[in-house]
Amino acid sequence: MKNVRHILIFPLILMMTAGLTGQNQVPKGDWILEKVDENYGSDNKIMTATMVIHGRRGSREVTSKIWVRGNDQSFTEYLAPPREKGTKMLKLGDQLWMYSPSTDRTIQISGHMLRQSVMGSDLSYEDMMEDPKLQNMYSAQVIGEESYMDRPCWVLELTSIKEDIAYHSRKVWVDKERFVTLKEDRFARGGKLLKTTEVKKVEKIDNRWIPTHALFKDVLKSGKGTEFFVDSMIFNAEIPDYIFTKAALRR
């Protein structure tokens, strides 16, 4: 009986400590990234969101509805303001198309165009094209522990494992308990800071902790950054196949 008890308990201990290393039980960076990806991951999701863009000449709001399937398919329709209403974007793998109702044209966004701002915000088309799974793009190392928003965080240094990537490295602050990224600095290959993200609010949606208010800042641009609000989110939603087609851009 004693041997049977050992056989049952030992695998449980291995499972509980699989992501830990060192005397102080510091988690491995790659294990933390995996947990972050698990928290955000979903086969399908539908979201409505509002961007508040704080530019040199004032602030403006842009509202959108976003359909996401897996890691490489998304469809975005802009709902407001009237000037942007009806603009749509489709991402399929490493390709991105945009439809403009004012010109009734669909164009493919590629090359240097990917670095351009989305709707004048601090986010680029390149940001939208990123693989949402960090572990697919970076290796991670825990470099410290800090508090952010009164939450204890692991501080991670992420280094790119791919050549064709917008940000060679990142520094991220991950909530120890909820496995949510609360703060992030993004760097060029030479170490120059390019963009920052600060999460202002986290909410539990469908048993997942999700940032619902964040401030993005392109440090190379003037202005006070872009606030991003998640107004609603449905995980594992039913999404018709036609949504992820070029024909849907003109509907």
Locate the predicted segments by residue.
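Bacterial N-terminal signal peptides that target proteins for export
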Residues: 1-10
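Short hydrophobic/aromatic-rich beta-strand segments that constitute the beta-sheet cores
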Residues: 47, 74-78, 96-100, 106-108, ...
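Gly/Pro-enriched, hydrophobic low-complexity segments
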Residues: 129, 149-246
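Acidic/charged, solvent-exposed loop-and-adjacent secondary-structure segments enriched in E/D, K/R, S/T
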Residues: 101-129
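Bacterial N-terminal signal peptides
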Residues: 9-19
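Short, conserved active-site entrance elements at the starts or edges of catalytic domains
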Residues: 121-159
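Bacterial Sec-dependent signal peptides at the C-terminal "C-region" and cleavage site
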Residues: 18-26
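N-terminal mature ectodomain segment of secretory-pathway/periplasmic proteins
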Residues: 27-102
